[in-house]
Amino acid sequence: MARAFPLERVRNIGIAAHIDAGKTTTTERILFYSGVVHKIGEVHDGAAVTDWMAQERERGITITAAAISTSWKDHRVNIIDTPGHVDFTIEVERSMRVLDGVIAVFCAVGGVQPQSETVWRQADRYSVPRMVFVNKMDRTGADFLKVHGQIQDRLKANAVPIQLPIGAEGELSGIIDLVENKAHIYKDDLGQDIEITDVPEAMKDQVEEWRAFLMEKVAETDEALIEKFLDTGELSNDELKQGIRTGVVKHGLVPVLCGSAFKNKGVQLVLDAVVDYLPAPIDVPPIQGILPDGTEAVRPSDDKAPFSALAFKVMADPYGKLTFVRMYSGVLEKGSYVMNSTKGIKERISRLVVLKADDREEVDQLQAGDLGAVLGLKNTTTGDTLCSADEPIVLETLFVPEPVISVAVEPKTKGDMEKLSKALVSLAEEDPTFRVRTDQETGQTVIAGMGELHLEILVDRMMREFKVEANIGAPQVSYRETIRGSSKGEGKFSRQTGGKGQYGHVVIEMEPGEPESGFVFVNKIVGGIVPKEFIKPSEQGMKETCESGVIAGFPLIDVKVSMVDGSYHDVDSSEMAFKIAGSMAFKDAVRKCNPVLLEPMMKVEVEVPEDFLGSVIGDLSSRRGQVEGQAIDDGTSKVSAKVPLAEMFGYATELRSMTQGRGIFSMEFSHYEDVPRNVAEAIISKNQGNS
């Protein structure tokens, strides 16, 4: 089938930012001006096209990454609108993994917020080229150049304005395009009647200064341009455009635009910039993967290359399970069979759809560079690779952060128990940061996630979508266990009870693993001293013990185990005996390896009037917090600190009463850190029964 849009005219972009920067409104306006919707939907009215879950429409925030296709100036633009709340970090993470470019939206008043830094780091992790839209220029206190300075200083970006606002706050009347050296004056409220004129006399000096700055920065992206600029001191408009594009694609430049999505000013220019400056799938390096023989390979963005795609999101849907895929190479046909190379299984593609928020269009095929969804995949989950069975490859998967907070869920009736298990399976398929376990001592179902809002929304969905009636416990911190030393461990399981006995014997060496490596098992058995069929059960026994912990019943992380010795009995040895022996050896080794308890440390940023600074810092210190920095700007103090999550429950209420309701704070997961001995002892003795 012929392509509707050649690959060089495809853009896969994300819109990302901190909460309340106006990201979803920007997406709505993009859909309005590009003709996908014929009426403007506002987030605060609960009418946004990309916010389609009931919880999103009620809360006015975006929770899941909605994928939508539109077109602009003969280009296909696939957009993912991502949430700004830190509890939904996985949604941003999974969209960054599959995008070719991103629009980072900043509030012209609030500027760079803690969550902006998180989103920026995620874009860095996947090397995503980006541009910036400084939104809300109509608001009191809007300052375009101040935000530009913050992006340079706090995000260490080579940010270059390619526009300037004409007026600000209530006086915002238009935008200067520094590339074309023209003014765009908005004549109506809908932002459709635009007059393009010369730069206003009063702004000529400022425009000249920033245009010279733009030329200098663009010249640095290319040797031929720098020569011309040094010779003539000028670059043509076309050279500027080409230079900006080269700089963006090579991560050397971040163009900064401005406007007000809510007031319908500047959105068409954002779309122009997406088409002009953000990369097509063929402009970014081809996706890398691993072949079955362990060698690295790449898949170019080409319909003729072998098929490969990444499942980046799974969603329960009234019509069945929807699996969102990013097509990297080849073509995917409706009705075909493909290989899930991550799990080593075949899957059938029942139907293919392209999404327009909660509206969908069925298609016969998806091609390289497309974002679409598949109906009918039974066993594919987030992060899995789909590929041609004849030419298998496993693509680099997603980074999934560890959950930091958990609550116990108790169904009210037996009927609710069945509904609950169905709901938990469905929600865990959709969201890799949502974990479910059974508490060994109490038998309760415990769910874990990225924060209180994350769990609140998941519980809300259980009750709404799956009609589960349940009692929810108080939030608990998700501690972890790890080791700080190395040692050998031995487990021998031997039982004679008449008839066939049980015998398994495992010897291991244990050492700390690489950060974020989880549990790593290495088989070093040689000469068949333990038969091959007993190696996997031994590993399984260790893995299960690792998941349920040894010292306090919390999952053990970042540990490397080598199975080095053991023995077996021709008649009495069994898989079960070796599974138990593996678990015994694991526990024995952990106890000798200086085990420690880890707790989630949160990056906390507090903004308060200057008068309250002393009380806030004192309070953070009393919560075992480490204050890392403070700054005062226009009478407002900003404090950044690392504080254990265990000490942060109820902080919002405490901060309100401490600052007469004038303090605000944001909190996101930073890292795991050793729990101080006296605190750890109390936690361990309380949880001893679980281990």
From Swiss-Prot:
CDD domains in the cross-refs: EF-G, EFG_III, EFG_mtEFG1_IV, EFG_mtEFG_C, EFG_mtEFG_II
Subcellular location: Cytoplasm
Keywords: Cytoplasm, Elongation factor, GTP-binding, Nucleotide-binding, Protein biosynthesis
Pfam families assigned to the protein according to its UniProt record, in alphabetical order: EFG_C, EFG_III, EFG_IV, GTP_EFTU, GTP_EFTU_D2
InterPro entries: EFG_II, EFG_III, EFG_III/V, EFG_IV, EFG_V, EFG_V-like, EFTu-like_2, G_TR_CS
Main location: cytoplasm
GO BP, one annotated term: ribosome disassembly
Record GO cellular component, one term: cytoplasm
Alphabetical list of SMART domains matching this protein: EFG_C, EFG_IV
GO molecular function terms listed in the Swiss-Prot or TrEMBL record: GTP binding; GTPase activity; translation elongation factor activity
Cystine crosslinks: none
Amino-acid positions noted as binding GTP in the UniProt annotation, renumbered to this chain: 17-24, 81-85, 135-138
tr-type G domain location: 8-282
PROSITE patterns assigned: G_TR_1 (PS00301), G_TR_2 (PS51722)
Biological role: Catalyzes the GTP-dependent ribosomal translocation step during translation elongation. During this step, the ribosome changes from the pre-translocational (PRE) to the post-translocational (POST) state as the newly formed A-site-bound peptidyl-tRNA and P-site-bound deacylated tRNA move to the P and E sites, respectively. Catalyzes the coordinated movement of the two tRNA molecules, the mRNA and conformational changes in the ribosome.
Similarity remark: Belongs to the TRAFAC class translation factor GTPase superfamily. Classic translation factor GTPase family. EF-G/EF-2 subfamily.
Protein name: Elongation factor G
Gene that encodes the chain: fusA
